[in-house]
A protein has these predicted regions:
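Short S/T/G/P-rich N-terminal loop/turn motif that feeds into the first structured element of a domain
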Residues: 1-94, 100-105, 111-114, 150-228
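An amphipathic, aromatic/His-enriched active-site/gating alpha helix that lines ligand/cofactor pockets
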Residues: 45-46, 99, 113-148
Length: 228
């Protein structure tokens, strides 16, 4: 597996710096983006459900990098125990240097089927209005006017990715939606027929297979963005 690619699956990570400042409601640009993303959660289906071939995607705002703790098993352990008793300027001087981001970032992470450019074209064509509203406060997005410039912008913000969503393989989105549908329907079938005698169970199973059509991806299935 190379960076970003595993078979026919692609893992995309974009980190897009957000401009400082506020909108017309005096809300910081990063917070305005966060509020809009929260509003997507209230929709029956996310705008990203319209984008072709998306297995799973996530947006979030990265405010800063976090220092979780001091290094273990060293002299800093002892010093950190007595730091609360020290004057403030001594405490700050004793702490290790911390890195911080110069901007807040809009992070977009997606696992999808296929190649990068057709996928980004699909995002733009199916959700251009939503994409503009989310990214408009990011540095560099002012130059995006069509699918081609959106692809160029995304490539400038892209980070190599080697970790994929473990709940998915590299089959087509239609095949994976079908598999989820069959799994759900078979669980329901097993629950409803567990007390049937053998002859009736066999007949019920044949009816189940005829209705579900497990080998037909174009037959009954889940829809993209569907909640179980």
């Amino acid at each position: 597996m190379t960076s970003n690619v595993s078979g026919k699956a692609y893992a995309l990570t974009l980190m897009c710096p957000i401009k400082g400042g506020t909108d017309n409601n005096n809300v910081a640009f990063a917070d305005a983006i966060r509020d809009q993303l929260e509003n997507w959660n209230a929709m029956a289906t996310s705008p990203m459900a319209r984008t072709p071939n998306t297995y799973l995607c996530r947006y979030y705002i990265l405010d800063d990098v976090c220092t979780q703790s001091l290094p273990g098993a060293g002299i800093w352990d002892t010093i950190s125990d007595i730091l609360p008793m020290m004057p403030a300027k001594w405490r700050l001087a004793a702490l290790p240097y911390e890195d911080h981001l110069k901007s807040r970032y809009l992070v977009f992470s997606s696992n999808f089927h296929g190649e990068l450019e057709p996928y980004l074209q699909g995002i733009w064509r199916s959700a251009e209005t939503d994409i503009r509203s989310i990214w408009r406060h990011c540095y560099g997005f002012d130059g995006v006017s069509d699918a081609a410039t959106f692809i160029d912008y995304a490539r400038r913000c892209q980070l190599d990715t080697s970790l994929f969503f473990v709940g998915s393989n590299d089959d087509s989105l239609a095949a994976q939606l079908k598999a989820l549908y069959v799994k759900q329907e078979f669980s329901r079938f097993a629950q409803q027929t567990q007390d049937l005698p053998a002859a009736q169970l066999r007949q019920a199973y044949l009816q189940f297979m005829h209705r579900v059509k497990p080998r037909d991806d174009a037959g009954p299935s889940w829809t993209a963005g569907q909640r179980a």
